[in-house]
Amino acid sequence: MHPSTVRREAERVKVSVRVRPLNERENNAPEGTKVTVAAKQAAAVVTVKVLGGSNNSGAAESMGTARRVAQDFQFDHVFWSVETPDACGATPATQADVFRTIGYPLVQHAFDGFNSCLFAYGQTGSGKTYTMMGADVSALSGEGNGVTPRICLEIFARKASVEAQGHSRWIVELGYVEVYNERVSDLLGKRKKGVKGGGEEVYVDVREHPSRGVFLEGQRLVEVGSLDDVVRLIEIGNGVRHTASTKMNDRSSRSHAIIMLLLREERTMTTKSGETIRTAGKSSRMNLVDLAGSERVAQSQVEGQQFKEATHINLSLTTLGRVIDVLADMATKGAKAQYSVAPFRDSKLTFILKDSLGGNSKTFMIATVSPSALNYEETLSTLRYASRARDIVNVAQVNEDPRARRIRELEEQMEDMRQAMAGGDPAYVSELKKKLALLESEAQKRAADLQALEREREHNQVQERLLRATEAEKSELESRAAALQEEMTATRRQADKMQALNLRLKEEQARKERELLKEMAKKDAALSKVRRRKDAEIASEREKLESTVAQLEREQREREVALDALQTHQRKLQEALESSERTAAERDQLLQQLTELQSERTQLSQVVTDRERLTRDLQRIQYEYGETELARDVALCAAQEMEARYHAAVFHLQTLLELATEWEDALRERALAERDEAAAAELDAAASTSQNARESACERLTSLEQQLRESEERAAELASQLEATAAAKSSAEQDRENTRATLEQQLRESEARAAELASQLEATAAAKMSAEQDRENTRATLEQQLRDSEERAAELASQLESTTAAKMSAEQDRESTRATLEQQLRDSEERAAELASQLESTTAAKMSAEQDRESTRATLEQQLRESEERAAELASQLESTTAAKMSAEQDRESTRATLEQQLRDSEERAAELASQLEATAAAKSSAEQDRENTRAALEQQLRDSEERAAELASQ
């Protein structure tokens, strides 16, 4: 008897279609409630109705013909899940119906040893995740659970039933990955704890093996024993899977998710001695794929990161469509097909599904569509792809080791023989027992050999892993040593850079200090010059003011003397009028003189008014002088504040430089002391901090320079104000000179008038005799006029007294103003002395800062020497590490030699086992031939016995 060949089955991809109910968005849209899809579940036919009207005028022109012609699509199964019955009146399909039709056969194929695959394809929001997972993705249990949890539940029920028979046990492992933006991420991979959002992604690589096929390198597979374990792992994966809300779907999958179930059978056999032999049996892989839905950007209205995700999703689905077209074309046309190789490697999704499409797998596809007219084009496109996928033919084979398959066949033969032995002829039963014993011994021997080979293979795999680990450790040590050397070089280079930068900063600081001191010296000199010039101008103005006041007083005294002379002359006239009689001509002349005296008195009143105006002008000049002094004080205060800010900035810069120096020293020591990546990160962070401190110092220096410029602008503004004040003062002086000239002109005119009056008085004395006749007539009138003149003179006297009092008040104000100015001058001198003392203290502080800087430089040099000593220690440690590495390499070489010797021994043992197996096979063939001959002889004897028995019976 020869071993049977591997069991292979060729069949098409099973394609099903599920039509979901209308959702809320479609019910609220004007055309959303219009159903364009009809289905016959019994006949597995889907009909896309004619879409009439012009409401969809914005659709693509390429769909125009499809809109005007109804199309029928034939599939393997159709699930009508709309609330109303289908075209034949059948009730809507439930989740349980989908599982009975699709999920149950998948479980049967898995336990038969066939690879299988189920993937959901369709537009976004068409119900793929609901069909695969269920109504609530976070709770995969209950009546609404999808195909995936139902398949897992059936697997565990079948597993318990098989293991109850006691011949084998099944091991189930689960993996969960997603394809996001053309990168494969392990959703069950170990992530860092305590990181928001699950931590970083755990990416795996897609590889292809000649015998294993496509697999994921580095994927984490977790053994599961119940549905609760599966639900827990899937919920963990869903927690880190990429989903988002779009216009089409509140929870849209932004990646393709694949749940991988691996089933491995472990068969057991008990020998006559009671030893239990365990061998590998069948194995299978089941891929449950939840594809991300295709979406139109105009409908889903995604942007930013979601737009990028939609681009990758549509690209991978387009590649899947191309693969389906190529495989379908190859299956239908054979050698005449346009392409001979499908573009699996154009996308990670199609590369993973390579065995499921046209390979070693029994594949089921479920296409989900929407019945609404809003999704007419997407529904029609999905149905076309699904119909095209039905043409793909897969050739699936049972995944079982040939030796294990032979053992299983022997066990099946032994079971058949045990059943044949029940109630049979004793001789035949005895013969069968002998054959059964031979078969059992052969099966046990094969099982033992297979177990030994498996153990040997496992041992070799362990040795290979150890060898690879040793090589990896060596390369890791070498790379670590190189990285350490590079790190030390970079650290030393960084320390040199930091030292050079520190020197540059110190030089820059010294230069800035010198420039600021020069600028301050210039500003002080300019302010001193301006102060001296203003003091000289104020002194000259004070002298001019005093001379003007003295001149005005002198003029006032002269006017008082002239007024006294006029009064004396008036008294003389009155006496002349009283003592003699005047003529009418004298009277007229006297009246004329009296009129002239009155006009002269008016002129004197005008002179008094002018004097009062001059007094007010003097007061205004004094007020402007006070304002000028106040502005000068403000300028001095601003200069003092600017100087104080400068000193504070210098102190702040020195503090920052000291801190930067301390940071750099600490960083240099830490960089030389530590050799791992964390220290390098701290060095970068500290360097960044130092750089920020330097930038802050530069910004502070810039702000100080800006303040200095503002102070200069303020000083210039004050200088312009002082110039304007000087111009106003010059204008006032000019007005005063003009007034003085006018008063002098009026005084000369008064003197000329007095001379004229004197001449007139002489003429009057000459004419007195002729006027005595009219004196008596005019005496009464003159007496009345005299009384008026006396009253007017009294008024003039009172006005003169008030003018004298005003003059005294002006003198007092002048004295007080002079005292105030002298006090301000003394305060300015005291302030200048204070500024000089502050400048001396600043110079002393600068000398102290220079001494501190020198001490800091000495400390830095000492720390640099210590750092160099530390570098020497590190170099010695590196040499010891190199020596240890050489020792480890020698140990590794000896280990490698030992492993190679063990490997050669294993190969020799394998050769011996192979020769023994060949001898066993030859002996087995001879035994089988003898057994066949014996069987033929026994059968001949049995026939002879039966004939003999028949003859005896007939007799």
Curated annotation (Swiss-Prot):
Subcellular location: Cytoplasm, Cytoskeleton
Kinesin motor domain segment(s): 12-392
Endpoints of the signal sequence: none
Intervals holding Sequence repeats: 704-742, 743-781, 782-820, 821-859, 860-898, 899-937, 938-955
Sequence segments annotated as region (7 X 39 AA approximate tandem repeats): 704-955
Entry's family note: Belongs to the TRAFAC class myosin-kinesin ATPase superfamily. Kinesin family.
Name listed for the protein in its UniProt record: Kinesin-like protein K39
Gene source species: Leishmania chagasi
High-level lineage: Eukaryota, Discoba, Euglenozoa, Kinetoplastea, Metakinetoplastina
